[in-house]
Amino acid sequence: MKVVFSLVIIVSLLSSPLLTFSLFSKSVYGDGLFMEELGASLGDRTANLLIRMSPPVVTTETIQQQSQKPEIQFRLYDNQSDQNFKEVTYFITIEKDGKTLLSDWFFNPNGNLTIEMQPRNQNQISIYGELDPIMNAYTTRGNDPVVAAGPIFLEGGLYHFIVRILTVDFSRTILPDDQQPVFDSWLSIGAAENAVLDVNGQQIPIKVLSYYDEIGNITYNQQANSINFTMPFSYDLERISDPANTVFIHQEVEIPKPSPLSAEGGYKGFTNGKDVTNVLMVDGNNETKDVVHFMIAKPAVEQIASEYLKKTGSNNTVEGLMTFSLIPSKNGSMAMGGAMDHMMPMDMPM
């Protein structure tokens, strides 16, 4: 039920006016979800690129414990007709924390490309697939996806996908450099951190999942009766405020129930000391734990970043920490278990 709930609330936020965007420029980008849809001009046509991860919820824990092999799906299609472009050659680069993990050519005659990620502890990524004889680009073997095996998705946080379109309609004709659309996208891998907190002599296990960056310093404040944790964050207000960029911070906190930290039945949330209770969502379906979601969209992130820069006296670009606090409260966000029993995951067609 946790996966279903996570998918439903993320999809609902994707349909919100605050998170919907379509840009028609040579280079477009977003900032972190399980799926992004970006648009760019392609001559006299508008090309949309859909990038999505399957399954939608991937974490370092599911990769390690379940040997999960997530797939990244790319679909380039005409915005007006909704038909795939044919003979598409993609030049795809994947980065993590500024380090290039993969950079290569991929081709699909039908415009749909699927890359299966096989996370492994090895020095570099190896790519397995048929080589197209014209473009010397990796393509699928029958119905099997291209496979990228190596040190990818082993760490949680944001992964940067840079996708350049080299051919469309005719695989033998490479588009001029100044006519090649470039899409910048960020997909999130959940970083799982566990801690045991001493609450008035009782040991309470807590799990925090971040879909933005690594979590650190999980503590309990007895005076405030709060669970606290931190996350690295770039307070680059120019990047955050860019109309072309979506920013979405999703954190999950798992709290056993009944326990001193779930006894009130509801929760208040704070980010950098700012009350964000209105963006908390609580999954109460599980009888043994509450799963509390911080779902912070771009307008709130902009305000939090602006206040942080004012307090620190910094300029528009600074690397720092973002703090989170969660407090059990009868006046906070309550569990939404009853309404979620009828929710089903959405299967978005390629």
What would you call each of these model-derived segments?
Residues 166-173, 329-335:
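Short acidic/polar inter-strand loop motif in beta-rich domains
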Residues 23-87:
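Beta-strand-rich domain onsets/edges
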Residues 68-72, 225-227, 245-251:
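Structural beta-strand segments of beta-rich domains
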Residues 100-135, 275-285:
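Solvent-exposed serine/threonine-rich low-complexity stretches and specific carbohydrate-binding patches
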Residues 1-31, 74, 269, 332-350:
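Secretory targeting signatures
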Residues 33, 167-203, 343:
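Short beta-strand elements
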Residues 239-263:
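Surface-exposed beta-strand/loop patches in extracellular or lumenal glycoproteins
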Residues 77-108, 263-267:
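Short flexible loop/turn segments that cap and initiate beta-strands
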